[in-house]
């Protein structure tokens, strides 16, 4: 595993531990070069309440690796989280920089009605 990935995972582990101590539902984001994924996970990490990604049927046909696709995923995960009864979440960026696609997803989720 590369040093860059190890440091990202170390940052992610530290923030997830803090979120688990606070016992809050978290919006977890993962990004790859072509896709972006978002999950709303319970405080104990045992259950996924809502999820969305660029691989979903509604979003698969369009471009998947850009900011516009991340915005659509953010709106979709917010809609599904509200349907599951979740309005407040902690944002887990999984060690990725809060910039570009990760930021676009977070902003769209806020627009969709989730409170961070």
Swiss-Prot record:
GO terms for biological process: translation. GO terms for cellular component: cytosolic large ribosomal subunit. The keyword RNA-binding applies. One of its GO terms (molecular function) is 5S rRNA binding. It comes from the Bacteria. Disulfide bonds: none annotated. Keywords: Ribonucleoprotein, Ribosomal protein, RNA-binding, rRNA-binding. It holds the Pfam family Ribosomal_L18p. InterPro entries: Ribosomal_uL18_bac-type, Ribosomal_uL18_bac/euk. HAMAP family: Ribosomal_uL18_B. This is one of the proteins that bind and probably mediate the attachment of the 5S RNA into the large ribosomal subunit, where it forms part of the central protuberance. Part of the 50S ribosomal subunit; part of the 5S rRNA/L5/L18/L25 subcomplex. Contacts the 5S and 23S rRNAs. This is Large ribosomal subunit protein uL18. It comes from Azotobacter vinelandii (strain DJ / ATCC BAA-1303).
